[in-house]
Amino acid sequence: MSSANNISGAPETGDFTFTQHFNVSATPSEFLASIWPYRHMMWIGPMLLFLAPRFYNTLKNTAFSRAYHMPYSILALHVFISFVDLANYHTQVFLANGAIHPASQIDALICIVQCWTSLYITAQHHLLPKIAMEVTRATFHCMSVQRLFATAMAIRTGDPRWHEASIMLLNNFIWARLLIAYCKMGRFSWKQRYGVGIVGSHLLGMWNGTYPHGIAIYCGLMVVLLNIDGWAKGRDSSVARALRYLGLATPADWYIKVGIDPPTKSAEKKEA
């Protein structure tokens, strides 16, 4: 890799030694700057320790898939491919001494499978907490769409920063649980903790991966997805049914399952 393409700032040749690359006698700010290119190596250890047991428990618990109306095989594939995607990326960065590598065709295929399973599970996950169901579901969709877009840009441009932005959105799994745990210290209900965890984790995932124009893309996607959901409510056309089937609109029976009255057009006009 040439120096022009080495955006991470990591050394390109030579064996990795701590004293060679980290100036331990420098000021705190200089030391932090010297270890920044190796943040991936520092992340992979805690990531594996945190995720591996949870992935195993999810795969072992078949009752979870039955409770949320989704095939166990799809859930197992989603968990497995997500773990493979994360481990593959961070391992390659580790072996390259912190250098970010561009996306390959295999990386693109793994991303497509992971996003497809995520979209499918979101479409089947009809029992999300009642708070801002549309917002949390749309955020899940945004994650998949933004990952696919970033991976496509990484393949098209060869810029490894797009690949990093795509992978770092998978860290939403960790950010969400940290935010939910943090909210337990306040006077938040479970529904509020869940909403903060899902939306907040996506924002942190974009920040973690320095997603180019991520906030603007996220806001634009949210406006489109929420308008699609609002249009499909109360309609029984083939298009509306297709949107509900694909998980892009609130299922007709969701309100009955969670025990609330479905919104009507007259009620929405009164609120407006």
From Swiss-Prot:
Transmembrane segments: 31-51, 67-87
Keyword Membrane: yes
Top-level taxon of origin: Eukaryota
Broad class of the protein's primary localization: membrane
Protein name as it appears in the record: Sordarin/hypoxysordarin biosynthesis cluster protein P
Key words, A-Z: Antibiotic biosynthesis, Glycoprotein, Membrane, Transmembrane, Transmembrane helix
Membrane topology: Multi-pass membrane protein
One Gene Ontology term, aspect cellular component: membrane
Organism name: Sordaria araneosa
Pathway: Antibiotic biosynthesis
Compartments where located: Membrane
Known function: Part of the gene cluster that mediates the biosynthesis of sordarin and hypoxysordarin, glycoside antibiotics with a unique tetracyclic diterpene aglycone structure. First, the geranylgeranyl diphosphate synthase sdnC constructs GGDP from farnesyl diphosphate and isopentenyl diphosphate. The diterpene cyclase sdnA then catalyzes the cyclization of GGDP to afford cycloaraneosene. Cycloaraneosene is then hydroxylated four times by the putative cytochrome P450 monooxygenases sdnB, sdnE, sdnF and sdnH to give a hydroxylated cycloaraneosene derivative such as cycloaraneosene-8,9,13,19-tetraol.
Carbohydrate-modified residues: N6, N23, N208
